[in-house]
Amino acid sequence: MPLLHPGDTFPQLTLSIPGAQAIQVPGWFDREFGVVLFNRGAWCPYCTAQLRAFQRAGDSLTQAGIRVAALWVDDEKTTAEFTARHGLTFPLGHSADARAVAALTGAFVNEDPLYLQSTGFVLDPRGRVIVSVYSSGAIGRLVPEDVIGLVRYLREHAAASA
């Protein structure tokens, strides 16, 4: 279970989206900065808070050129209901194979019941990891304000050095 470090190419993951065509990240980010979030499930209040925070920051993320995609092990029905209830406009993938995702990304897995622990990645426009945040439990995760600030910082410094 290798951890992904800054500069590593993010592995291709397919996210099954309720009622829509599956997407593949990092390609879905379409040469923009990307955020990939792994969440424990709809039952987790910390996961709900994180996903709602990224939804509330949607306009700011868009203005900063950042796209968001998330996934968890919950089934399609639960994911569709959660997405509708919280008005998520970014893709939330369902029925993730926790062990397969962990093998590709190094995410921590809870065995019983089986789910991914909170994990987050910020990717550059070429699909390389800028930051990886691994949690072994309920807390410790990316927040949208930090992601926006980081991307703005990177853009400002790239422009200054060009």
Residue ranges: model-predicted function:
Residues M1-A162:
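Chalcogenol-based redox active-site neighborhoods
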